[in-house]
Amino acid sequence: MPAPYVPKKVEDIIYYYYAKLVIAPSAGFERNYGFIIDTYKRLKSGDIQMSDYDREIVRIAEKTDECAFCGKKSSDCHPVHVVPRSLGIPPGMHNLVMACEGCANSKKEKDLMHWWCEELKQPRDEVPRVPLGLYLKIAYEMNKINFCLKKKCNSLGEVFSRIS
C-alpha cells in the first residue's frame, strides 16, 4: 500500500507502484521507501516519465520459452494478455507475455492483480517485473485517454475499474 501521504488517485497509485518497480531491481532498494517516494515525486512532477514498452517487449522476445509469471522454462509457452481484452485494450504486443500452460490456463482473461493476489494468494509486491510493468503502463494509458487519472482509487487492483 502506498505511503499515507500519497494521494488516493489513479495516477498516484500507478506512479507509486511504477516507482517501486523501477527502484527495486536496479539498485537493490526493494524496501527503501526514500528512493521510492523520490521517484514517485519525480514522476508526478514530470521530471521523469515511465519508459515506453520497448524494455518489456525485448525481455519477452528474449525469453519466449520462459513463463513470465512463474519463471518455468517450457517449450510450450503461450501468449497471454496481461490486461483482459474485455477492458477495451487495443490489440498489440504491449499486452502480451509468454506463460507456461499452467499459468496460462489459470490466468485466462483475468485481471493480473486479481488473479495474482486473490486467486493465487501471492503478495502484490511479488508480481513479476515484466507483467507488472506492462500492466502499469497500460493502466496509465487507458486511464489517461478516458480522463480518469484524477479519479479516486484505493488500490492497484482498482485502476481499471475507474475507467467509464
Ranges and model annotations:
Residues 163-164:
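C-terminal, charged low-complexity interaction regions
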Residues 2-12, 18:
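Short helix-coil boundary/hinge micro-motifs
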Residues 160:
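Flexible, polar/acidic helix-loop-strand segments at domain edges
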Residues 2-4, 26, 100-103:
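Short, charged low-complexity linear motifs
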Residues 1-2, 67:
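Residue-level detector of intrinsically disordered, flexible termini
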Residues 100, 108-109, 128-133:
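Short C-terminal domain-edge/linker segments immediately following a structured domain
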Residues 66-98, 104-123:
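Histidine-centered nuclease catalytic patch
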Residues 16-66, 124-151, 155-156:
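Short, charged surface segments at domain edges that flank catalytic/cofactor-binding sites
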